[in-house]
Amino acid sequence: MSGGDDLVLHNPVEDGELSAIFMIRNPSGIHVRPAGTIVKLFDGEDCEATFTYLGKTVNARSVMSILMLGASYNGEITVRIKGPSASRVMQKLAEVFNSGFGEL
């Protein structure tokens, strides 16, 4: 993926589940600040979400779980979200991933 189109959206994967692949654009990868930004996006949202990176899948609503992925620059994270808020949260995630978490 290149340019401004760093999101591949497949809708739906299963009943009500969304899936997307995001490229990590910020040079420092997913460290504490971006992980915290991601988790805050889920505040008040009714959905379940997972991130998969290099074959490892974790709860996307947990800073520690996200950090354990060790996701680095130019890596791709597969996101799966299910629930009433899935579409809204996926859009928010697209915005922060595509902005490089404000580190570009």
From Swiss-Prot:
It is found in: Cytoplasm. This is Phosphocarrier protein HPr. It comes from Chlamydia muridarum (strain MoPn / Nigg). The keyword Transport applies. General (non sugar-specific) component of the phosphoenolpyruvate-dependent sugar phosphotransferase system (sugar PTS). This major carbohydrate active-transport system catalyzes the phosphorylation of incoming sugar substrates concomitantly with their translocation across the cell membrane. The phosphoryl group from phosphoenolpyruvate (PEP) is transferred to the phosphoryl carrier protein HPr by enzyme I. Phospho-HPr then transfers it to the PTS EIIA domain. One of its GO terms (biological process) is phosphoenolpyruvate-dependent sugar phosphotransferase system. Residues 17-104 form the HPr domain. The active site is at H31. GO terms for cellular component: cytoplasm. InterPro entries: HPr, HPr-like, HPr-like_sf, PTS_HPr_Ser_P_site. It holds the Pfam family PTS-HPr. Belongs to the HPr family. Keywords: Cytoplasm, Phosphotransferase system, Sugar transport, Transport. CDD domains: PTS-HPr_like.
